[in-house]
Amino acid sequence: MDQRLICSNAIKALKNLEENSIDLIITDPPYNLGKDYGTTDDNLNFNKYLEFSHEWLEECYRVLKPHGTIYIFMGMKYISYIYKILEQDLGMYFNSWITWYYTQGIGKTRGYSPRHDDILMFTKHPKKFTFNLDRIRVPQKYYRSVNNMRGANPSNVWEFSHVHYCNKNRKPHPTQKPEALYERMILASSNEGDIVLDPFVGSGTLNFVCKHLNRSGIGIDINKEYIEMAKERLDSEFNGFDSIDERMKRCPNDLSDPVIRKQYIINHINWFLKNHENAREEFLNEVKTKYYKKMTQEEKRLLDKENNLSFDFS
């Protein structure tokens, strides 16, 4: 399927799209927190940011088909205002407030460490919208005879880890999202051959996932470097989506890449044991069970040496 990448101001590019031409919109806009996206648009004053948000959301509403859906990632500071714009100003219909939970977040010493992001799901029609539940069912936690044997409906709390440094798909973008996150939304709210849009495409996750799910993708970003990054990503080898991050359970299930494994060992295992000494034996067993056979002789020697995990690769 066709994958379009447009280097442009989002609002300007949206105005060039036809009315009622998009089946699904998924986007992670600037949160106005001063992050460096290569532009100054993430540091607007309060009213300017709301004006900017209203303008691009209004254009999204215009291009969205009558049965279409929009998913928006948004930080807590502005999410209630985005909700108001969608529901009261544009007349869209609220469907779900999704919590994306992840195990590693930003460390804080004067407050609780953030461990989730929020995603708003709105539809253009209250009842007539695409939602393919059977494409996204998850295994039942407990078996009951009344259960749907195809699996359970995912809750509105989704557990996917961040795209960490140990992930091969990591790109130099400050807010790269996991492919599996987009995969679930695209499978649920679009069909093969549909057109999916991201007005703030960043590292190109949406187009990459659309390509391998047989959807046409349109990605817009004002940063030329990000557009080039997204183009290169489309041409990269596909080995499945990063549905389960290696660090989700603290001990990766697959560390076949020796470079990643070495970095993981140096940066993570020592930290874990320093802070979880009471779990030392259990953790060592997990390491051996899950990827001991994949280790080099040097790594095995370091692991076995009196179980002293003070790894030194110098």
Curated annotation (Swiss-Prot):
Molecular function via GO: DNA binding; N-methyltransferase activity; site-specific DNA-methyltransferase (adenine-specific) activity
Assigned EC number: 2.1.1.72
Top-rank taxon, per record: Bacteria
GO cellular component: cytoplasm
Enzyme class: transferase
Gene3D superfamilies listed in its UniProt record: Vaccinia Virus protein VP39
SUPFAM superfamilies from the UniProt entry: S-adenosyl-L-methionine-dependent methyltransferases
Disulphide linkage map: none
Keywords: DNA-binding, Methyltransferase, Restriction system, S-adenosyl-L-methionine, Transferase
Catalytic activity: a 2'-deoxyadenosine in DNA + S-adenosyl-L-methionine = an N(6)-methyl-2'-deoxyadenosine in DNA + S-adenosyl-L-homocysteine + H(+)
Gene Ontology biological process terms, A to Z: DNA restriction-modification system; methylation
InterPro entries associated with the record: DNA_methylase_N4/N6, DNA_methylase_N6_adenine_CS, RM_Methyltransferase, SAM-dependent_MTases_sf
Pfam families, A to Z: N6_N4_Mtase
PANTHER family recorded: RNA METHYLASE-RELATED (PTHR13370), TRNA (GUANINE(10)-N2)-METHYLTRANSFERASE HOMOLOG (PTHR13370:SF3)
Assigned protein family: Belongs to the N(4)/N(6)-methyltransferase family.
Record's protein name: Type II methyltransferase M.HpaI
Protein species of origin: Haemophilus parainfluenzae
Annotated gene: hpaIM
